[in-house]
Amino acid sequence: MTLVCGRVNFFSGPHLVFKYWLRGKFMRIIIVGCGKVGSSIASELNLEGHEISVVDINHGAVDKLANSLDVLGIEGNGATYDVLIEAGAEYADLLIAATARDEINLYSCLMAKAAGVTHTIARVRNPEYTNDLYRIKEHLGLSMAINPEQTAANEISRLLRFSGALEIDSFSKGVVELIKVTVPQ
C-alpha cells in the first residue's frame, strides 16, 4: 500500500521556482559568468531552445561556450550597462548573474533592471548577504537570489528528514511538501 501525505514547511526556498518560470516558455536569457555554474545553466537552457547570451570578462571562457553551444558570447564586464545592452538586455526576459563574486552578481542585476530586463536572478554565496536577502531583493528588484550551498544543505536536510520517502514534491515555493511512502501491510 502506498500512502501520500502532506507537510507544510514554513521555510520556503527558491530552489524550484526557477524551473517553473521556464517550463514551456521561450525566453531571451542573459547569463553573466561563464564558469562552472554559468556554463551548466547555459547548457541546460540551450537544450530547451531559449535564446541565450553569455557575458564574461574571460575571453577563453566566452569563446569556449560560444563555440560549443548555440549562444551569443560577449566578452566584457556584465555589471556595466553598455555590455548588457550589447548582450540584448533591452529585450531580455531574464538575467542570471552567476559569477564568483556576489557584488558583481548583485550589481549586474541592478544594471539589468535599469536596461529593461524583466526578471533577474543573482547567485549570492556570502552568509552576511544572505541574512539580508529579503531587503536586497526588495531594494534591487531581484526576482530571486540563490545561495547554492544553503540550498544544497536545505535539500539534504529535507531528504534526511524523510529518508523512507519514495518521493518528495514541493509546492507553493517550498511551503508545502507532498510525501509518498510505502506502508507495510
Task: Give residue spans per PLM region.
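Cytosolic regulatory regions of ion transport systems
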Residues: 1-3, 7-9, 14-185
